[in-house]
């Protein structure tokens, strides 16, 4: 009986990276429930057996994928704020965050049946890791921008959270206007009032 080829650490790393890319694409286009291990493996050009040498479950891949997306998003937002260090720069970072939310609804809309189907299969400790600490994220973004608030931190956070939640009204808004333009106007106006 011929032996199966052994994957090197580099091969494993490359396959994991490719699987996470495919997982993100499929999560955006068809959701968690409709994404199967078999279809991911076919697209990645690997066997299902190879998948299981890298991940114990489908949920492990999805968890690793959402962690990667969150980390990438944080890095992008913090980089904009570190590079610009102005109110305009902070507003630009919020616009980028809004665009990410628009392209990846599972980042903000965690109450959908599809996301709930994913999250309920995770161990409690993993669920805690998935939950994005948005207040801490806000605090770090403000710190990266070196901006000073005109108001209490929790109020500023609440205002920006409410602003970002307008993504939930995008279908209603898109009937009469470009919801990105509306968001951009609001963020530019509010950032001027929130920061010194």
Residue ranges of each PLM-predicted region?
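Short, hydrophobic secondary-structure boundary micro-motifs
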Residues: 106-111
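Helix-turn-helix
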Residues: 26-60
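Hydrophobic alpha-helical connector segments
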Residues: 64, 78-105, 160
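Basic, helix-initiating cap at the start of DNA-binding domains
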Residues: 1-30, 38-39, 43
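Short amphipathic alpha-helical elements of helix-turn-helix/winged-helix folds
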Residues: 22-26, 96, 166
